[in-house]
């Protein structure tokens, strides 16, 4: 799929939202942001997703992470739809802004186009404070996102960033579980970086590349 991808800087577009107008880089500044698009207002899967984002808002807040939605409908449509979202989700308030893109000018620049349906996709970018894309998900219109996986992936990115990307998170990792040390870090460096110690897996190759440690 053409367009911006991992490591690319999100273009500093001026956007109109359900809150106000702003430039994307101003919104991204000094925090991580979950930027997510949906195929359309007043659609079933999207209603459940945006409601779940509202319900999980406290989880993003405590991580210092902002939310920002996007759809190819106008601001008034978004505001009317929010009433349905909040009613269906038992009052969870949609307090995050939703970008309006009725002319479909923004989604191509953010690489949020469904290549099969040639319309707005169910995409999600996790954007760092440097306005660069750190992770992307792209789902077909038939499949809703899993908020727990979004949080898990976000926690992984935050943990790696905290340790200058000298660690990585293994399969099915969750917070408070061991991480692995980057192969770029020598054992001598690892001893200094991780005074709590690390365990090297005893594998047939004897290459010593799989090292687990505890971090916080």
Curated annotation (Swiss-Prot):
GO terms for biological process: maintenance of seed dormancy; response to desiccation. Induction: By abscisic acid (ABA) and oxidative stress. The keyword Translocase does not apply. It is found in: Nucleus; Cytoplasm. Its EC number is 1.11.1.24. The active site is at residue 46. Predominantly expressed in seed. Expressed in endosperm, embryo and aleurone cells. Also detected in young seedlings, abscission zones, stem branching points. Pfam families: 1-cysPrx_C (PF10417), AhpC-TSA (PF00578). It catalyses: a hydroperoxide + [thioredoxin]-dithiol = an alcohol + [thioredoxin]-disulfide + H2O. The keyword Nucleus applies. The active site is a conserved redox-active cysteine residue, the peroxidatic cysteine (C(P)), which makes the nucleophilic attack on the peroxide substrate. The peroxide oxidizes the C(P)-SH to cysteine sulfenic acid (C(P)-SOH), which then reacts with another cysteine residue, the resolving cysteine (C(R)), to form a disulfide bridge. The disulfide is subsequently reduced by an appropriate electron donor to complete the catalytic cycle. In this 1-Cys peroxiredoxin, no C(R) is present and C(P) instead forms a disulfide with a cysteine from another protein or with a small thiol molecule. Belongs to the peroxiredoxin family. Prx6 subfamily. Thiol-specific peroxidase that catalyzes the reduction of hydrogen peroxide and organic hydroperoxides to water and alcohols, respectively. Seems to contribute to the inhibition of germination during stress. This is 1-Cys peroxiredoxin PER1. The gene is PER1.
